[in-house]
Design a protein with these regions (language model features):
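Glycine-rich phosphate/adenosyl-contacting loop at the front of the ribokinase-like
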Residues: 1-66, 80
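Gly/Thr-rich phosphate-binding loop signature of adenosyl cofactor/nucleotide-binding cores
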Residues: 83
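Short phosphate-engaging motifs
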Residues: 53, 77, 90
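Gly/Ser-rich phosphate-binding catalytic loop and adjacent alpha/beta segment
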Residues: 71-78
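Short beta->alpha junction loops/turns
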Residues: 47-50, 74, 124
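Ribokinase/PfkB-type carbohydrate-kinase core domain
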Residues: 1-8, 60-62, 68-71, 86-148
C-alpha cells in the first residue's frame, strides 16, 4: 500500500553569496529538493521579498520543477554573505530581518499541513517570532502519523 501525503521543508530559503557567485540554499528548501529528487511529492515553504532575488528564487525553483509555497512579503529575500579566510575557512554573515524571518501562516499552508507525510524544519528560521510561530503552528496542524 502506497503512503500518500507530502514531504515538506519549511523555513529558510535564501541565497548563499560566495566569492565565486551566489547559490540558492536554505536547509529546509534543500531538504524538499532532495526529497523530490528521490521521487517523493515534496514542497518547499518559506517567504520571499518583493525583489529581484525573490524573482530569481522562483525562477530557480521553476527550473528545478520544485513545488513551493513562498508568499511575497515586505522584507528582502534572505542572503548569507560567505567570506573565506587565507586558509579557505568560511565565515558567514547571515542577514537579519529578511523574508524568511517573517513567514506568514496562510490558509494554503494550513491545507498542506493537514496532508503532510513528513516535515523538516531547522532552528535558523526560528530566530524570529513570526517564522517561529508559523513553523510551530504548521507542525501542530500535521497529522498524528506525520514524521516530524
Amino acid at each position: 500500500m502506497e503512503k500518500k501525503g507530502r514531504v515538506i521543508g519549511i523555513g529558510e530559503a535564501l541565497w548563499d553569496v560566495l566569492p565565486e557567485g551566489k547559490k540558492l540554499g536554505g536547509a529546509p528548501a534543500n531538504f524538499a529538493f532532495h526529497a523530490k529528487q528521490m521521487g517523493l511529492d515534496s514542497i518547499a515553504i518559506s517567504a520571499l521579498g518583493n525583489d529581484d532575488l525573490g524573482d530569481e528564487t522562483i525562477a530557480a525553483f521553476d527550473e528545478k520543477e520544485l513545488t513551493y509555497l513562498m508568499p511575497r512579503v515586505d522584507y528582502p529575500t534572505g542572503t548569507v554573505q560567505v567570506k573565506l579566510d587565507e586558509n579557505g575557512v568560511p565565515a558567514y554573515d547571515i542577514k537579519t530581518n529578511v523574508a524568511w524571518d517573517n513567514i506568514p501562516l496562510t490558509d494554503e499552508m494550513r491545507e498542506i499541513a493537514r496532508d503532510a507525510r513528513a516535515v523538516c524544519w531547522g532552528s535558523l528560521a526560528q530566530r524570529n517570532d513570526v517564522s517561529r510561530n508559523t513553523i510551530h503552528d504548521f507542525v501542530k496542524l500535521t497529522p498524528d502519523n506525520c514524521l516530524r
